[in-house]
Swiss-Prot record:
Residues 33-100 form the BTB domain. Residues 135-237 form the BACK domain. SMART domains: BACK (SM00875), BTB (SM00225), Kelch (SM00612). PANTHER family: KELCH PROTEIN, KELCH-LIKE PROTEIN 41. The keyword Repeat applies. It is found in: Cytoplasm; Cytoplasm, Cytoskeleton; Cell projection, Pseudopodium; Cell projection, Ruffle. Interacts with NRAP. Part of a complex that contains CUL3, RBX1 and KLHL41. Interacts with LASP1. Involved in skeletal muscle development and differentiation. Regulates proliferation and differentiation of myoblasts and plays a role in myofibril assembly by promoting lateral fusion of adjacent thin fibrils into mature, wide myofibrils. Required for pseudopod elongation in transformed cells. One of its GO terms (cellular component) is pseudopodium. Ubiquitinated by E3 ubiquitin ligase complex formed by CUL3 and RBX1 and probably targeted for proteasome-independent degradation. Quinone-induced oxidative stress increases its ubiquitination. This is Kelch-like protein 41. CDD domains: BACK_KLHL41_KBTBD10, BTB_POZ_KLHL41_KBTBD10. One of its GO terms (molecular function) is ubiquitin-like ligase-substrate adaptor activity.
Length: 606
């Protein structure tokens, strides 16, 4: 049966190719031409049969009672000859040169003359090219040409990145109906409804005179019951534009009653207010006004999670519910990498052990990736100018800092500091660290970067601590750690820098210290239950967690060897002690660990 299908498909492809080549030859040789399309000062010889087969518009025209002379020469008004030429060639060859400069014109013309094959190719192209800079224009095009597939794709793209896109100038130029099509969407990726309200009011103020009259209609798409009541009183009720609009004031009164627990009776004739949404508490027939909608947006399912990134996958762990979620596959992420999460909740992975066997001059590479939270994919960024390992990572104002480490080629200790600017998309060097160091740790807090411990050129552990101010561009010494160490865990927890475990001059350590940023003093904390190196510390939602690392474990041969452990511990602040949570979480093997906020709505439970 399969062989028969394969034969049938082979014959179909052969016949299609033969037919396409034959049609192309007939056009080029101008054989059997029976009509001409005229656009501007250009004429395009064609075949009625081909045009009719590819377009309902032309089929109806050529089958109509129009006199024969008009069918032979068809004048097309307001048509760009160059665009028409591309479309005609596609009909005969199934090949078209689409680019950002011509796709919208080709799309519009194929829509006008009902040529679905060209139309579909344009839609697919535009869907693949969606970006923050063009998504609103593509949304507008999809709505204008009545193409639901394109409009929905663009709207979902905007919804996923609403916080970013609502700040764009294009957003301020949306028509009322275009704005409504965006903000009425359940899948809007906002953690707070306040973001939607502020975006709408900024849109209104961009053209206050004309848009204030549309406010009532747009108002219906904002889900005020999802706001904090205090915010509603301070920012919505007191807004000058809202106070001066009698129609909106009526709705404000209803909302005030709703916050007090008194909802109006659902009405079968109540308008949806452009939202197309039904209140979750009532049936399909009994509707509340759109501005009383209390269905959470998709972005409101965000939760604080521990992200474990290794060379197989990025898995999010919820310590409160003891659940794991697949965030992204990570086969391109090297082992022994470092990772960081920025203040804007952007996850980056830097470095790791990767050997490019095809590159004879520089076989060792330090790659750089960013996690796209929307597509759950890793985006490649410019790699480090020179490969290094055992470095520290910091972040200030969305810029990533790679501090010191070891050169992968020469194994020399480094004091250089690299800075990645995401706007310029390039690396540059900033002020060197005062000493060459590797195996240290770096943490960022309140616009400053802290570099702690590590090993110096003489392979001895240091207890020195430095602070870097990116605005001043200088490093300064802070109070040294009590115990010199390298390969330890670090986290900012309740306003203090906490470090745990690591390697000291005497071997593995279980000691824990905390640095008070206000007093510039170190204090001893409760020891970790086991001596470990490379332990990960994560402060999440007010709790401190310790994950994995390497410990000296006795083997069957009775010898002790460094062995990776993949357990999770929690520090109980009130009792000042460590409590075991999980004996093993396999996703922690070879993983870097981060505290991040992820949307459970987009994750798959493992």
């Amino acid at each position: 049966m399969d062989s028969q299908r394969e034969l049938a498909e082979e014959l179909r492809l052969y016949q299609s190719t033969l037919l396409q080549d034959g049609l192309k030859d007939l056009l080029e040789e101008k054989k059997f031409i029976d009509c001409t399309l005229k656009a501007g000062d250009k004429s395009f010889p064609c075949h009625r049969l081909i045009l009719s087969a590819c377009s309902p518009y032309f089929r109806e025209y050529f089958l109509s009672e129009i006199e024969e002379e008009k069918k032979k020469e068809m004048a097309l008004d307001n048509v760009d000859p160059a665009i028409l030429d591309l479309i005609i060639k596609y009909l005969y060859s199934a090949s078209i040169d689409l680019n950002d400069g011509n796709v919208q014109d080709i799309f519009a013309l194929s829509s006008r003359f009902q040529i679905p094959s060209v139309f579909t190719v344009c839609v697919s192209y535009l869907q693949k090219r969606l970006a923050p800079g063009n998504c609103l224009a593509i949304l507008r095009l999809g709505l204008l040409l009545d193409c639901p597939r394109l409009a929905i794709s663009a709207r979902e793209f905007v919804s996923d990145r609403f916080v970013q896109i609502c700040k764009e100038e294009d957003f301020m130029q949306l028509s009322p109906q275009e704005l409504i099509s965006v903000i009425s969407n359940d899948s809007l990726n906002v953690e707070k409804e306040e973001v939607v309200f502020e975006a709408v009011m900024k849109w209104v103020r961009t053209d206050k005179e004309n848009r204030a009259k549309n406010l009532s209609e747009v108002f219906d798409c904002i889900r005020f019951r999802l706001m904090a009541e205090k915010y509603f009183k301070d920012h919505v009720e007191k807004d000058d534009i809202i106070k001066s609009n009698p129609e909106v004031q009526k709705k404000i009164k209803v909302l005030k009653d709703a916050f007090a627990g008194k909802l109006p009776e659902p009405s079968k004739s109540a308008e949806k207010g452009g939202t197309g949404e039904v209140n979750g508490d009532v049936g399909d027939e009994d509707l509340l006004p759109g501005y009383l909608n209390d269905i959470p947006r998709h972005g409101m399912f965000v939760k604080d999670l521990i992200l474990l990134v290794n060379d197989t996958a990025a898995v999010a762990y919820d310590p409160m519910e003891n659940e794991c979620y697949l965030t992204a596959l990570a086969e391109q992420i090297p082992r022994n990498h470092s990772s960081i999460v920025t203040q804007q909740n952007q996850v980056y992975v830097v470095g790791g052990l990767y050997v490019d066997e095809e590159n004879k001059d520089q076989p060792l590479q330090s790659y750089f990736f960013q996690l796209d939270n929307v597509s759950s994919e890793w985006v490649g960024l410019p790699p480090l100018p020179s490969a290094r390992c055992l470095f520290g990572l910091g972040e200030v104002d969305d810029k990533i800092y790679v501090v010191a480490g070891k050169d992968l080629q020469t194994e020399a200790s480094l004091d250089s500091v690299l800075c990645y600017d995401p706007v310029a998309a390039k690396w540059s060097e900033v002020k060197n660290l005062p000493i060459k160091v590797y195996g240290h740790n770096v943490i960022s807090h309140n616009g400053m970067i802290y570099c702690l411990g590590g090993k110096t050129d003489d392979k001895k552990c240091t207890n020195r601590v430095f602070i870097y101010n990116p605005k001043k561009g200088d490093w300064k010494d802070l109070a040294p750690m009590k115990t010199p160490r390298s390969m330890f865990g670090v986290a900012i927890h309740k306003g203090k820098i906490v470090i745990a475990g690591g390697v000291t001059e005497d071997g593995l350590s279980a000691s824990v210290e905390a640095f008070d940023l206000k007093t510039n003093k170190w204090e001893v904390m409760t020891e970790f239950p086991q001596e470990r190196s490379s332990i990960s510390l994560v402060s999440l939602a007010g709790s401190l967690y310790a994950i994995g690392g390497f410990a000296m474990i006795q083997l069957e041969s009775k010898e002790f060897a460094p062995t990776e452990v993949n357990d999770i511990w929690k520090y109980e602040d009130d009792k000042k002690e460590w409590a075991g949570m999980l004996k093993e979480i396999r996703y922690a093997s070879g993983a870097s660990c981060l505290a991040t906020r992820l949307n459970l709505f987009k994750l798959s439970k493992l």
